[in-house]
Structures are given as structure tokens and as C-alpha cells.
Amino acid sequence: MIRIGTRGSLLATTQAGGVRDALIARGHPAELVTITTAGDRSSGPIESLGVGVFTTALREAIEEGRVDAAVHSHKDLPTADDPRFAVAAIPARNDPRDAVVARDGLVLAELPPGSLVGTSSPRRAAQLRALGLGLEIRPLRGNLDTRLNRVSSGDLDAIVVARAGLARLGRLGDVTETLEPVQMLPAPAQGALAVECRAGDSRLAAVLAELDDADTRASVTAERALLAELEAGCSAPVGAIAEVVESIDEDGRIFEELSLRGCVAALDGSDVIRASGIGTPGRARELGLSVAAELFELGARELMSGARHDPARGN
């Protein structure tokens, strides 16, 4: 029996349940073990809680032998590799885009100036401000139902959340607008899961690897390499999206390329620096580093140093 560690929220158990079911379907008995994390116990702003707030307890459970593997939202994992653990599988990604849930079925552009929009993310807040719509950004914590209720109760005019989370809970009917990357670049690895186990557990790693999706792994690798190079941690105002696309060469042969778009935004929305690049899936990390270097050349370091010392970040 493979014991799979998961956070206790409905979204987390739904995600981990999908991994469990996929393993069982392949003939590998598996069960979920709920682990409470520091992020679940705190009601403070996510960016004030530190990197790894949702993952440390799950990793401790692996290390102590209480579980064999853990399922993380990949974007919650620290960008620095931990030699004690291995990401044995990155399953096929859900939709990485952000989504708006607004009152009266409105889209962002239809909300009047001064409307209250909730988000848990400095990245979303910065890009929302950059749209120049005069929206008032408010902090947002709690599970998805709690967040959605803040709109239905009239407390907020809209919220912006990951579309993947709504999809996994069967709540896509609440979405009033899906934000394309040109409007808002998602968080690196948004919509992707990471299935992690002990680094030395090669037998279990081989079993978990049956769930791995090569295109998703390449995309996530590029996005997180960009994030790591920018030294941003998971709450900094950095967006990135990569995808494997088919191209045709001069001889009419189809081949795969990996495209990557990235951005760094000033927290007040006064500036958004964007860069993009194309590489191959086999050199995903190099593509991430290349686009990060271009962002630095365009002034990302100055923008990010301002973000790190912004009092709104609490650090």
C-alpha cells in the first residue's frame, strides 16, 4: 500500500485523490494520509508565511516514514532542490490560467473603478493594478468555498484565483472570465502537481513515474528555472507560462519546441517587464535561465529589489 500524504483541504485531497486513483488503476494499491501544514493553521497573508509553508510538513512526513509519497501543488514547492527528496512524477497539467469570479457575471473590464477585488497573490495584485482599471485590491485567504462566498455575500465584487483549482472542485460554472496570459501571466507551475518521494526510494519512484507527463515536466522545469534564477520565492510578483508546441521545419517535418513567456511586475502595477523565448523540451532549464537573463537586462533586478522592501509585503 502506497501511503500518499496530502494537505487536508478539499482541493488538496481532490488533487491527491486523483493521483491515488491513477495509481490504483495501474494496479498499485494506494491510500491518502492527511497532514496539517503551517499554512493551513495560519490565517495570515501567504507572502508573510515564508517559502515552503504548505510543503514542509508533508516532506517531514516522508522523511519520518509516516507516508511514502506526497502530492504538492507544484507552485508551492521551494525552487531550491532538496537532495532528500525526488519529484518522481509531474502528472499532466490542468489549465494554468487565472480566472475571475465576479458579481453579476461581469468580466474585469466591466467592473467600475473602485471595485473590490480579492486575491491571495502579490503576482496577481501587481498585474491587476497594471491593467489600469482602478480596481481596489484586497487580501484573500481561506479555502475556495470561503473565497467564492466573499463574492456571493457581497463582501467583494470579484476574486481572482487559479482556474485549475476551480476545475478540480467542479466549480467552473462560477467563472465569469478566464484571463489569457497576455492579460495575466500565471504563477510558475500553476495548475501542475508534484508527486514527491524519498530520493533513495528508486522502486517507488519508478512506480510513481508512470504518472509523469513529459510535456508538463518540460514546461514546469522552464518556468521554475526562471523563477529560481530571479530568486523570487513563491510569493514574489513573477509570472511565467511555458508550453510545448509543434512546429514544421523547412522540409515539412514536424518537431516540438518549448515556448516560455515570463514577467516581473512592480507591486503597485506601475511597471511590468516581459520577455519570452523558444527552446527545446530537452533543454527546458536552459530556456528558463535565458528568459530570466533577458528580464534582468530589461531591469527586473531593480523592480524586484523594490518589491522585496515594499512595506506591503511585510518584509
Curated annotation (Swiss-Prot):
Protein name: Porphobilinogen deaminase
Gene Ontology biological-process annotations: protoporphyrinogen IX biosynthetic process
Pfam families (UniProt xref): Porphobil_deam (PF01379), Porphobil_deamC (PF03900)
Naturally occurring in which organism (per UniProt): Mycolicibacterium paratuberculosis (strain ATCC BAA-968 / K-10)
UniProt cofactor(s): dipyrromethane
Enzyme type, top EC level: transferase
Secretion signal span: none
Subunit record text: Monomer.
